[in-house]
Amino acid sequence: MLKTHSCALTQENVGTEVTLAGWVHRRRDHGGVIFIDLRDREGIVQVVFNPEQSAACLDIGKELRSEYVLQVKGVVSHRPAGTENNRMPSGMVEVVAVHAKILNAAKTPPFYINEEVEVDESLRLKYRYLDIRRQGMKNNLIIRHKAVRFMREFLNDQGFIEIETPILIKSTPEGARDYLVPSRLFPGKFFALPQSPQQLKQLLMVAGMEKYYQVARCFRDEDLRADRQPEFTQLDMEMSFVDEEDMMKLMEDLFTGLVANVRPDMKYNKKFPRISFADATEKYGCDKPDLRFGMELADITDIGASSAFGVFKNVAAQGGAIKAISAPGCGGYNKSQQEELINLAKKYGAAGLVPISLGVENGELKDLTMEMVKSVAAKYLALEEIKTIAERSGAKPGDLILIVAGARKMVNTVLGEMRNQLAVKLNLCDKNELSFAFVVDFPLFQWDEEGKRWDSVHHPFTAPLESDMPLMDTDPGRVGSRAYDVVCNGYEIAGGSIRIHQADLQRKVFHLLGYNDEQIDERFGHLLEAFEFGAPPHGGVAPGIDRFVMLLAGETSIREVISFPKNQAAQDLLFGAPSVVDDKQIRDLHIRIQAEKE
């Protein structure tokens, strides 16, 4: 080894002769004595080049610049009194160099490595190997390593075995577009990269493996956003002879144990509340609610229906919904600020937004007067009606009530989005808190108005509630599913369900989704045939590793916890991928590039 110790030296190492190797983090010339901060993965330590110890070392010290790779030998010493640095873990000690060797020089980096300054993300991704040298990215990857290591150890202790499944599989579209791989040996035929190992892990249950897991790479050719990548990693799990309670207990123990081991400084709930899908959408406007703050959606349809406000009366008469949320402390918003909120509501599909300001002074709701209320709706609503709206939405004097009216689904979506954005703007979320919950009681199917057909809410392998089986023939929209999601801080961090394990029931679900028998047999025949050989009852779940590590690290994009991510256009800026390949490779694959029509 070119080093005997890491740079994470402490007072316990005083008097020890060490050989270190790392990167020059900073260099300071103090009139004949040169100081550098030497950095490796474990830490940073000050190294002193003093001519009284070694003139040759001083000469090397004069050559050093930021990011040079250096080997240095010396003795760990206490720093002189008054020069200690309490901001560094190694700030009480230094290494006095007696031998030094430059292992490699370095060009000037395109951005500072030794400062956590904001750098354009495209530049960071192009030079990701330099970006990872920075403390924030390095810490994120270490958190990821610790999280994955805990997951493996936890599941091993629970009797699971890790089994790898193929990356080249058959294309059986499950929602998103597949990444296709043309076969050279079978012209005109294609493999697909797995969107998840869903069918493979179910086949492992048929095979009698009972408890399986895998740190699985998954691929989906879909539009990107902050928490999506074309390739991502999930902790894939499946168990035989279990029900929903077993799987939810496993998830609760896994996530709480993980936080306790990897980020014990974070606040988290050890028992996960259960929220029905219906309650989640009605109270929070989405099926992955952030429970770190209140601001629940309040239904005020009955108040609007009996009020003198024509807009509200019409919506209620047509079977629509009228709902409100309270923005705490925003009663003093001016016209421009309120207009900004109105435009935000319109962006998400609302025809408009009705703000009701309860004044700028904090106080009790019982003390509210009409003089304090500022709103275009004030002349149509009685004081008692406004007080009731305030009471339901949790508003008090000094707050701003925001009301949306229209189709119920739209109202929930708009206020749900506004709730989340206002929470960020008003600093209502504690970044150091993880608020877990289970979302349950999902419907099995949802109607696709555009395609005029039923879709799976989760995926087509999710089992229906046994009590709802008769409804599959008469009213599929009312069939409940045996699905369970884990949500945290406004993200779905794990989705799971008890699976269908009978061939006839699985075929029936496919029929409801619009597949004919020929399509079913061509795409899923292998699975249905396997179910005829004694498939056990089974269920599974797949926590998203990228997304949960993002929350553990306090980040807002999964790109911050992936070593070499794609950008939001699904491009790899470091390698320049996707890229053009030569004509011979194209011909060997028996494919032809067709120019896109303008």
UniProtKB/Swiss-Prot annotation:
SUPFAM superfamilies: Class II aaRS and biotin synthetases, GAD domain-like, Nucleic acid-binding proteins. L-aspartate binds at E174, R220, H458, R499. Its main location: cytoplasm. Keywords: Aminoacyl-tRNA synthetase, ATP-binding, Cytoplasm, Ligase, Nucleotide-binding, Protein biosynthesis. Gene3D superfamilies: Bira Bifunctional Protein, Domain 2, GAD-like domain, Nucleic acid-binding proteins. Residues 198-201 are annotated as: Aspartate. Aspartyl-tRNA synthetase with relaxed tRNA specificity since it is able to aspartylate not only its cognate tRNA(Asp) but also tRNA(Asn). Reaction proceeds in two steps: L-aspartate is first activated by ATP to form Asp-AMP and then transferred to the acceptor end of tRNA(Asp/Asn). HAMAP family: Asp_tRNA_synth_type1. This is Aspartate--tRNA(Asp/Asn) ligase. It comes from Dehalococcoides mccartyi (strain ATCC BAA-2100 / JCM 16839 / KCTC 5957 / BAV1). The gene is aspS.
